[in-house]
Amino acid sequence: MFRIFKMSFAVIIIILALIAFNYTEHTSVIQSVMLVFLGAVMFMQGLEERKKENDGSGAFNIYTAVFVWSVSLIGFTLHII
């Protein structure tokens, strides 16, 4: 089940990267949205690693996902200001 979500989020990230490459004037918003999906992929990967009893790698992925989400939140708020 996680694999389907990870693959769909990865496809969304690739599509957003291609859109950001074509529209250079709106990249700040697209990059923040792309970071949200990247964080979701990393979070799901962390949950999978925790299920495999690989707690160190799973915790690292979850912490990194939270960091990526906080960076995207900062990007959203800076774009609004």
From Swiss-Prot:
Pfam families: DUF3953 (PF13129). It is found in: Cell membrane. One of its GO terms (cellular component) is plasma membrane. InterPro entries: DUF3953 (IPR025018). It is a multi-pass membrane protein. It comes from the Bacteria. Its main location: membrane. Keywords: Cell membrane, Membrane, Transmembrane, Transmembrane helix. The chain crosses the membrane at residues 4-24, 61-81. This is Uncharacterized protein YczI. It comes from Bacillus subtilis (strain 168).
